[in-house]
Amino acid sequence: MVYRAGMSWTDPRGEIEALVPQLRQLRRDIHRHPELGFEETRTQALCRAWLEARGYAPRVCAETGLVADLRPGAPGPVIALRADLDCLPMHETTEIEHRSVHAGKAHKCGHDGHTAILLGVAELLARHREVVPGNVRLLFQPAEEGVRGGGAKVMVAEGALDGVAEVYGLHNWPGFPKGQVHVRSGAMLAQVHELTITITGKGGHASQPQLCRDPLVAGAHLVTALQTVVSRGLGYQGGAVVSITQFTAGTTHNVIAETARMRGTVRSFEAGVTTRVMERLREVIAGTAASFGVKIDLEVDEGYPVTANHPRCAAAVARVAALQLGAEKVSEQCLPMAGGEDFAYLAQAVPGGYFFVGSQRPGEDTPVCHHPDFDFDDELIPTGIGLFLGIVRDRFAELG
């Protein structure tokens, strides 16, 4: 990590670097013992012990999450920083020393690294507690990966952001060059709706399709027709993606199935666009059902809303990143992206700033998030700590 001159309030560079070996070991311990959403009891206990040893009084929030205040009741604004705790229901394929000991559970999105970063921030803030000009609230959030609607929504409902002026979160991203920060005002990530489509026809023998109403044929037509929802429904402006990702029907080779099922997603960056897409999608489904004489049922699981940055918060992140890493390392390229994030609920409740820290190693095909070979790059730990601390200094200087 390269720092530029201009660090104010405190200059934690040496302290950060000295802390990295301990945080690396801690991160790999979390990686070795992954836990799914709302099951992060071991991770929660680890974070609680770390925080209590440094003078915090963490309180449980959202079952397996924690909220910890640096200076409860201090005058001035409260700045919140968030890390997600949970793993993915995936198998670890790597042979790294700290690979997962739990089959079907693995940290393949880097939340172990995010947690280590925020614990490092907690350490540095605690060392300088008396000179921090306000309260910093640390959010250790469970269940970002979509279990029961996500942990961020629960944390908001349980008051984790009460009295908070602004909230910030980061995510490692192997798709961006290592050492870059990607951030913008407005939409960062998409609203995501999950679709389940059930087609009911009339089954029968494969030799007599004329006596059947084949849900597989109707479904094949529907998959193709749905690709026109955006291209012909929204035109060149687009702004949405409709993807059918699962299609199942039948049990054997000589029977026309009674039912077929499809699953997929609708993603967009504006609520109004999502509404138009869903209207057109229902029209296409109704037309397909009528054309093929089948019944088609649509279930929609409304997922996370658009993750949108407040202009003031996005500017603060960009300003701090430019100061610490250089202006050439700050970019809006490839944003917004069509993934979803429950940080959206935090940024709906109070002004928020969400940003990506690149981890793509030069000359390497770095595994992306959710790939079975992914592992968090520990060299991002000091970068993340420095950025979070810089944001805290910047926000107190402006808002204080």
Regions found by a protein language model. Name each.
Residues 8, 15, 19-26, 39-50, ...:
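General structural feature for long, well-ordered alpha-helical segments within catalytic domains
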Residues 80-82, 91, 195-197, 354-360:
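Non-cysteine beta-strand/loop elements that form the S-adenosyl-L-methionine
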Residues 6-107, 112, 116-133, 137:
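Acidic/His- and Gly-rich active-site-bordering loop/insert found
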Residues 30, 68, 81, 111, ...:
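Divalent metal-coordination and catalytic microenvironments
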Residues 88-90, 94-106, 112-113, 128-257, ...:
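Histidine/acidic-residue-rich, glycine-tolerant segments that coordinate divalent metal ions
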Residues 217-400:
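Metal-dependent amide/peptide-bond hydrolase catalytic core
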